[in-house]
Swiss-Prot record:
The lineage of its organism: Bacteria, Pseudomonadati, Pseudomonadota, Betaproteobacteria, Burkholderiales. The active site is at residue 248. GO terms for molecular function: dihydroorotase activity; zinc ion binding. The modification N6-carboxylysine is found at residue 100. One of its GO terms (cellular component) is cytosol. The gene is pyrC. It is an enzyme of class 3 (hydrolase). Its cofactor is Zn(2+). Keywords: Hydrolase, Metal-binding, Pyrimidine biosynthesis, Zinc. This is Dihydroorotase.
Length: 344
């Protein structure tokens, strides 16, 4: 049984850092484990221009504690009105690494998202030409589609036509949650990748309802059936370079999670690599963790691997019950429980 594992320093290819006091509270958790992260642009207002991304990047770097090294990889928020010229500027900037597609209303702060992907044709053509990846929240938002089917329907309605019309466009299917998505990404032609969260590797939808409503397990896309969790584990541990780490760590104040209309999102930045190690260990695939965490993402984005390392040790430790979060608190996933791995 492996007791210690040292891997190339990993990256997080899907992260929510928020802004202001919330940013300052959560950024150190990510920077302790990850060298770089793709930063989601769904602030209020959303980050839709290169100038806004530059300003947000500056705020992130200003919030980084002294002595910590971390590179934020910025993204733009795609709207019906994003001009192709903004894509050219994004490519030239050197710090914008993707454009995020949120179907309007799909998740937190997505109201300004795309209402019809066909309206973005000229912009998508510019992205294909400039080599700027499209990062996709892969769910339809039609009220007549069951919430557990939104991802599968998205593949047929949006992803397949998108890939047909823009076959050379780099596409990341973010935080996949279904067997359908894992199979689609594995078999798709052209430059397609996918991020997978730790919580979707570890839990199925029963976790939300065990002994009562468990709001800290509620995220979007929502946890699915066990057959889907198993398919995600198989994909993540397959060795395929198309699958890579993206925590989708999404902090919300405790009062906004434990609420009559609670927010979606699991906070895992504090203990992300410990959770991934647990999932890969349970699958008997610790030898595949480094590629998933540290190699596949940089290869897809055309970036070099990190030079540092991170060590995971089989060691019991108790996760805090809550964490400071501005003038309130934040509850990490599995708060107060014992974890079996420790990252250093």
């Amino acid at each position: 049984m492996t007791q210690k594992l040292t891997i190339t320093r990993p990256d997080d290819w899907h992260l929510h850092l928020r802004d202001g006091a919330a940013l300052a509270a959560v950024l150190p958790d990510t920077a302790r484990q990850f060298a770089r992260a793709i930063i989601m642009p769904n602030l209020k207002p959303p980050v839709t221009t290169v100038d806004q991304a530059s300003a947000y990047r500056a705020r992130i770097l200003a919030a980084l504690p002294a002595g910590m090294a971390f590179e934020p990889l910025m993204t733009l928020y795609l709207t019906d009105n994003t001009p192709p010229e903004e894509i050219v500027a994004a490519r030239a900037s050197g710090f914008v690494h993707g454009v995020k597609l949120y179907p309007a209303g799909a998740t937190t702060n997505s109201d300004a998202g795309v209402t019809d992907i066909r309206r973005c044709a000229a912009t998508l053509e510019a992205m294909q030409r400039e080599g700027v990846p499209l990062l996709v929240h892969g769910e339809v938002t039609d009220g007549d589609i069951d919430i557990f089917d939104r991802e599968a329907v998205f593949i047929d309605r949006v992803m397949k036509p998108l890939r047909r019309d823009f076959p050379e466009l780099k596409v990341v299917f973010e935080h996949i949650t279904t067997r359908d998505a894992a199979q689609y990404v594995a078999e798709a032609e052209g430059p397609v990748g996918a991020t997978i969260t730790a919580h979707h590797l570890l839990y199925n939808r029963n976790a939300i309802f065990t002994g009562g409503i468990r709001p800290h397990y509620y995220c979007l896309p929502v946890l699915k059936r066990e057959i889907h969790r198993e398919a995600l584990v198989k994909a993540a541990t397959s060795g395929s370079p198309r699958f890579f780490l993206g925590t989708d760590s999404a902090p919300h104040a405790r009062g906004l999670k434990e609420h009559a209309c609670g927010c979606a999102g699991c906070y895992t930045a504090l203990h992300a690599m410990e959770l991934y190690a647990e999932a890969f260990d349970a699958a008997g695939a610790l030898d595949k963790l480094e590629a998933f965490s540290s190699f596949n993402g940089p290869a897809f984005y055309g970036l070099p691997r990190n030079s540092g390392t991170l060590t995971l040790t089989r060691e019991d430790w108790e996760l805090p019950a809550e964490l400071p979060y501005g003038d309130t608190t934040l509850v990490p996933l599995r708060a107060g429980e014992t974890l079996r791995w420790k990252a250093s």
